[in-house]
């Protein structure tokens, strides 16, 4: 699917990156504060579910030792393409976040995980494995959906601006279960989505020895729920 996350950076865009402070996004609507990257001097970074030829090349240009792990081979090919074009070194690994990560304990200084766990039903493995492969004092930067937006019918939110917004679903929203119950139909092109709860997202990190040291919210202004609150959350945790 062609969208904002599948368009690799151009040579000109990467030249701009070289001459400016690091600028990457975990969520829609806001860039990660550059101070987050200043909280470690380590340069070994894992971009988790982070393929597409965007963040990976930015990190490489900024002097990081970059590994990108993604389930999508086509997304990884975009990183390989940009790396070859620009003479950058990016290690690409095809992998599944729901399985053990193919890395040794305490390998990385930073894990950078843009919004993606909305497509994963059980977060337990992601946070356990992230903590395992992070070095002590390493940073986990993760973006995820604010669960409240899943209480509304997405078709009405996005495609029917004149219809009244009504609460429809309880949290945690699980589109696979709802489809099995005959309550919704999911377009296979987009896959199943899972809202999770703030407890599963935040406590999932804390109970694995990750302490939260910063946090922000951001907003996707392309839909009308954004008038009522922020629909994205990003957290910064440090491994104790």
Regions found by a protein language model. Give the residues of each.
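Conserved alpha-helix/loop element of class I SAM-dependent methyltransferases that forms part
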Residues: 9-43
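A short acidic, Gly/Pro-enriched loop at the edge of an enzyme's catalytic core
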Residues: 98-111
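A short glycine-rich, Lys/Arg-flanked "PGG" loop and its adjoining helix->strand segment in the class I
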Residues: 124-139
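Short alpha-helix
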Residues: 192-215
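A short SAM/SAH-binding and catalytic strip from SAM-dependent methyltransferases
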Residues: 109-124
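Core SAM-dependent methyltransferase catalytic element
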Residues: 208-210, 224-240
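Class I SAM-dependent methyltransferase SAM/SAH-binding core
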Residues: 43-100
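Conserved class I S-adenosyl-L-methionine
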Residues: 139-179
């Amino acid at each position: 699917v062609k969208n904002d996350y599948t368009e690799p950076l151009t040579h000109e865009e990467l030249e701009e990156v070289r001459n400016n402070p690091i600028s990457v996004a975990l969520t829609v609507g806001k860039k990660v504060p550059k101070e987050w990257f200043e909280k470690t001097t380590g340069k070994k970074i894992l971009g988790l579910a982070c393929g597409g030829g965007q963040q990976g090349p930015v990190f490489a240009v900024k002097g990081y030792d970059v590994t990108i792990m993604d389930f999508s081979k086509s997304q990884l090919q975009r990183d390989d393409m940009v790396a070859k074009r620009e003479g950058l070194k990016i290690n690409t690994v095809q992998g599944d976040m729901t399985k053990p990560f193919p890395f040794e304990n305490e390998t990385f200084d930073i894990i950078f995980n843009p919004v993606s766990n909305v497509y994963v039903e059980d977060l337990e493995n992601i946070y356990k494995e992230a903590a395992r492969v992070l070095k002590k004092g390493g940073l986990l930067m993760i973006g995820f959906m604010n669960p409240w937006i899943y209480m509304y019918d997405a078709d009405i939110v996005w495609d029917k601006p004149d219809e009244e917004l009504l609460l429809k679903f309880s949290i945690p929203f699980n589109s696979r279960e709802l489809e099995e119950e005959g309550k919704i139909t999911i377009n296979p092109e987009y896959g199943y989505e899972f809202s999770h709860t703030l407890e599963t997202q935040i406590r999932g990190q804390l109970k694995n020895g990750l302490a939260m040291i910063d946090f922000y919210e951001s907003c996707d202004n392309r839909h009308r729920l954004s008038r009522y609150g922020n629909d994205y959350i990003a957290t910064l945790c440090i491994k104790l």
